[in-house]
Amino acid sequence: MTQAPVQTDILEIAREQVLERGEGLTQDQTLAVLRLGDDRLEELLGLAHEVRMKWCGPEVEVEGIISLKTGGCPEDCHFCSQSGLFQSPVRAAWLDIPSLVEAAKQTAKTGATEFCIVAAVRGPDARLMAQVAAGVEAIRNEVDIQVACSLGMLTQEQVDQLAAMGVHRYNHNLETAKSHFPNVVTTHTWEERWDTLRMVREAGMEVCCGGILGMGETLEQRAEFAAQLAELEPDEVPLNFLNPRPGTPFGDLEVLPASEALKAVAAFRLALPRTILRFAGGREITLGDLGAKQGILGGINAVIVGNYLTTLGRPAESDLDLLGELKMPIKALNETL
């Protein structure tokens, strides 16, 4: 009896392991994908799309985000213009509840299922928690949309309070691989972020955790990050691409090449076959319109529509038109769900 040859091509391995069996790539396998030449990009994106369609389905989840408290953050995340430690043009400001509700209404009109309230803080104080509670209640009373929050690091009491408010999902990004994190943030640790995510999961809220690509990490660290996210098993992974902000320590870094960004999108899909993988900040400057289409046909199954926290995004209509062109049903508008 002739023994079947051992498969050594990483995409053939991924086809059998991920597409057929639903088992995500290991760290070493993800690294092999990230090292593929541009001549195999189309093949890679096609496989990632097949994986997404088989294990997640065709629906695309749409989300909007709003900044409840902008700027003045005491942390030194080197990519962020909201840090009070850097000479960036962003200044501290609070959003009132009526404006928050109106933003949720406008987001819901796009077909979004998720509306995320974000605050630039290390972690929420009593004033912010009270404002969030009022905002969540007002939105739930007036808008048919699920509410998520992103408020930094939490105590157990705050986690329990958010769960009691009916917060559906909590976002807290690990941002990058554990080995690279000290080069990105020095005012708190990667482990502190992990602890918040663990408490969120144990409280019954969905976990949203991703990061930013293009912050000087190596391909090895990118693969490490994907493996660490796979260990966490978040419900959603937002993938941002560094949009260098003036006045920040990363303000002079180069934008990630589009082919490298698309390879990363596909690699993360192959490492996380069943996870909601969301296009987030920086895709406009990194990928443009063509790259956005390639990403959605290369593993992405969720988008943030409209603007981000301190940068402009694509108009919501542009993303919705693109999804229509690609025949990708929007989750909130799909009557079968």
Curated annotation (Swiss-Prot):
It is an enzyme of class 2 (transferase). Pathway: Cofactor biosynthesis; biotin biosynthesis; biotin from 7,8-diaminononanoate: step 2/2. GO terms for molecular function: 2 iron, 2 sulfur cluster binding; 4 iron, 4 sulfur cluster binding; biotin synthase activity; iron ion binding. It catalyses: (4R,5S)-dethiobiotin + (sulfur carrier)-SH + 2 reduced [2Fe-2S]-[ferredoxin] + 2 S-adenosyl-L-methionine = (sulfur carrier)-H + biotin + 2 5'-deoxyadenosine + 2 L-methionine + 2 oxidized [2Fe-2S]-[ferredoxin]. [4Fe-4S] cluster binds at C73, C77, C80. Residues 58-283 form the Radical SAM core domain. Homodimer. This is Biotin synthase. The lineage of its organism: Bacteria, Bacillati, Actinomycetota, Actinomycetes, Mycobacteriales.
